[in-house]
Amino acid sequence: MGHKVHPTGIRLGIAKDWNSKWYASKADFAAYLAADLKVREMLRKKLAQAGISKILIERPAKTARVTIHTARPGVVIGKRGEDIEKLRKEVSEMMGVPAHINVTEVRKPELDAQLVAESIAQQLERRIMFRRAMKRSVGNAMRLGALGIKVNVAGRLNGAEIARSEWYREGRVPLHTLRADIDYGFAEASTTYGIIGIKVWIYKGEVFDFSQVGQEKQDDSPRNDRNDRGDRGDRPSRPAREAR
């Protein structure tokens, strides 16, 4: 099942959190969801050059709080905060409530799957060889601490008449492990030959809850091991032999 479902959707509540956090009645739920989708679409179009990783939306007490995770916060904020103020007014009109916009910087964009996918898409649009773009992104992610990464590109690669898909992986990407922290991103490259889809999976480690972390700490408590015996530990003492 790990290869059939969305890597983020199957891990919600286990290793991943929701991008929208609010409660609504049945009558308002559809309107809230539609507004969230429109706001995200508008922000991604206007901030296409800002390297948007994800957009979190919260609705506390008849207000809206939008958190934009970006690799280039200066592009979002603008000179003296003029651009972000325009965005705030537009978001308030779309959502119908006062809105606040927070900007969070992505420290390592090479470890963000969405940003990696968009970077590969931009390279393909500049007619860079897809294998070179894939290997460069994989190498940067592994160098900065990723435990595994997989990149899949599909379409008319290098202008071939027949579309195909190719993938490159380094490290391990356990899609069947629900507690695995796997970041997933998707982007499309519009080339002269057609659209090329890029999918990226980045494995960053495992997520444990507090009870499991406590158990691990107990299991990892130091034992009375001897240096010359490695990990075998102390052996039970034998009774001394009687002298003849």
Curated annotation (Swiss-Prot):
Gene Ontology cellular-component annotations: cytosolic small ribosomal subunit
Keyword Kinase found: no
Biased composition (Basic and acidic residues): 216-244
Cited Pfam families: KH_2, Ribosomal_S3_C
Domain KH type-2 per the UniProt entry, residue ranges: 39-107
InterPro entries listed in its UniProt record: KH_dom (IPR004087), KH_dom-like_a/b (IPR015946), KH_dom_type_2 (IPR004044), KH_sf_prok-type (IPR009019), Ribosomal_S3_C_sf (IPR036419), Ribosomal_uS3_bac-typ (IPR005704), Ribosomal_uS3_C (IPR001351), Ribosomal_uS3_CS (IPR018280)
Spans annotated as Disordered: 213-244
Keywords: Ribonucleoprotein, Ribosomal protein, RNA-binding, rRNA-binding
Gene Ontology biological process terms, A to Z: translation
GO MF, one example: structural constituent of ribosome
PROSITE patterns for the chain: KH_TYPE_2, RIBOSOMAL_S3
Family of the protein in this entry: Belongs to the universal ribosomal protein uS3 family.
Functional summary from the UniProt entry: Binds the lower part of the 30S subunit head. Binds mRNA in the 70S ribosome, positioning it for translation.
Assembly behavior: Part of the 30S ribosomal subunit. Forms a tight complex with proteins S10 and S14.
Name used for this protein in its record: Small ribosomal subunit protein uS3
